[in-house]
C-alpha cells in the first residue's frame, strides 16, 4: 500500500513543487514568447488582489510557481493561508524579474483561484454544521492530477479528508455487496486487507442493511440517500447498539448547503460532500504590475 499522504508542511511543499513544475511545462513548454519583449534583467513589483471575499488557500503553490522561474523572488503575504480576505484586498506582494512574474502570473493565479474556491466552499459548509457533532468530509470527485491539492484545500477550509484513493482505505459500496452476497459477507471478504487500510467503511441503503453491518462489526457506515425519518431511525439504531458495537455514521447523497443543518441535526458524525471539489467556483484574483 502506498502511504497515506500526511499533509505535513514538507510534504505539501514537495507536492506544490511537483504540481507547479507540471503546470508550468503545460503553459510555458520551451519558452514564453510574449515575455521575451521584456529585457532579461528588468525588475518588477506585482500585487495580487482578491476581487471577492474568500478563504485564501494555495500559498505553497503560488510560491513554488514563482520561485521555479525566479528563485530569488521576494514574496510577502498580506493574508495568511486559511484566513478570510475581503473583496478588493491586496493579499500578496511579489518582487522579482519582470519576465519571471509575467510568465508565472496565469499559473500562479490558477492555483490560487481553484484552491481558494475549494477552501471557501468548504468553510461555508463547515460553518453551517457548527455546534453539531457532524464534520464535513470530501470525496474522490476531484480534478484529475490535482486530488491532493484539492484535499489540502478542504482541510484548509475546515473539512476532513475521506480516503485519498482506492489504495489507502476500504469503502464497500452496493456493487461490492451484491458481488459478495450481502453486507456481512462483504465485510468478511475484506478482512485480509483491513490491516493495510486506514479504515473500512460499508455503504448501506436500508435500515436492515445497517443492522446487518452493525452485527458484523462494521466500525464506519455510510448511509446512502436516506430520507430524514430514516436517518433519524438509523442514528437511534446505532446508539442502541452499545458502545462496543456502535459505528461512525456518515451521510452521502443529495447534500446541499441549504439542507445541511437539518441533516447534521439528526446526530450523524460525518457528511460527505462531492461538490466541495467537483463543482468549484474559482475565486476571482488579479495580479497588477508596477515596474520596479
Q: What are the roles of these predicted feature ranges?
A:
Residues 2-216, 220, 232-237, 250, ...:
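Acidic/glycine-rich phosphate/pyrophosphate-binding loops and surrounding catalytic core
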Residues 222, 226-228:
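Extended hydrophobic secondary-structure segments
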Residues 286-291:
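Active-site loop ensemble at the mouth of alpha/beta enzyme cores that anchors a bound cofactor
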Residues 225, 253, 274-275:
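Short secondary-structure boundary segments
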Residues 238-242:
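Conserved hydrophobic residues forming the short capping helix/wall of the S-adenosyl-L-methionine
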Amino acid at each position: 500500500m502506498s502511504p497515506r499522504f500526511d499533509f505535513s508542511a514538507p510534504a505539501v511543499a514537495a507536492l506544490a513543487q511537483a504540481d507547479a513544475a507540471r503546470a508550468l511545462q503545460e503553459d510555458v513548454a520551451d519558452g514564453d514568447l510574449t515575455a521575451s519583449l521584456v529585457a532579461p534583467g528588468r525588475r518588477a513589483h506585482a500585487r495580487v488582489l482578491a476581487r471577492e471575499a474568500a478563504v485564501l488557500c494555495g500559498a505553497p503553490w503560488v510560491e513554488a510557481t514563482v520561485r521555479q522561474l525566479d528563485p530569488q523572488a521576494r514574496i510577502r503575504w498580506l493574508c495568511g493561508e486559511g484566513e478570510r480576505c475581503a473583496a478588493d484586498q491586496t493579499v500578496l506582494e511579489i518582487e522579482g524579474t519582470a519576465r519571471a512574474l509575467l510568465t508565472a502570473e496565469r499559473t500562479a493565479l490558477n492555483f490560487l483561484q481553484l484552491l481558494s474556491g475549494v477552501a471557501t466552499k468548504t468553510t461555508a459548509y463547515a460553518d453551517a454544521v457548527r455546534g453539531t457533532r457532524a464534520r464535513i468530509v470530501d470525496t474522490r470527485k476531484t480534478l484529475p492530477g490535482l486530488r491532493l491539492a484539492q484535499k489540502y484545500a478542504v482541510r484548509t477550509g475546515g473539512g476532513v479528508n475521506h480516503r485519498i484513493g482506492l489504495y489507502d482505505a476500504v469503502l464497500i459500496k452496493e456493487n461490492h455487496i451484491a458481488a459478495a452476497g450481502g453486507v456481512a459477507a462483504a465485510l468478511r471478504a475484506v478482512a485480509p486487507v483491513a490491516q493495510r487500510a486506514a479504515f473500512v467503511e460499508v455503504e448501506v441503503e436500508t435500515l436492515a442493511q445497517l443492522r446487518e453491518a452493525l452485527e458484523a462489526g462494521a466500525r464506519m457506515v455510510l448511509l446512502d440517500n436516506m430520507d430524514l425519518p430514516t436517518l433519524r431511525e438509523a442514528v437511534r439504531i446505532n446508539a442502541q447498539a452499545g458502545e462496543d458495537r456502535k459505528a461512525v455514521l456518515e451521510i452521502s447523497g443529495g447534500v446541499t448547503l441549504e439542507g445541511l443543518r437539518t441533516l447534521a441535526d439528526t446526530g450523524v458524525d460525518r457528511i460527505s460532500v462531492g461538490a466541495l471539489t467537483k463543482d468549484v467556483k474559482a475565486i476571482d484574483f488579479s495580479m497588477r504590475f508596477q515596474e520596479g
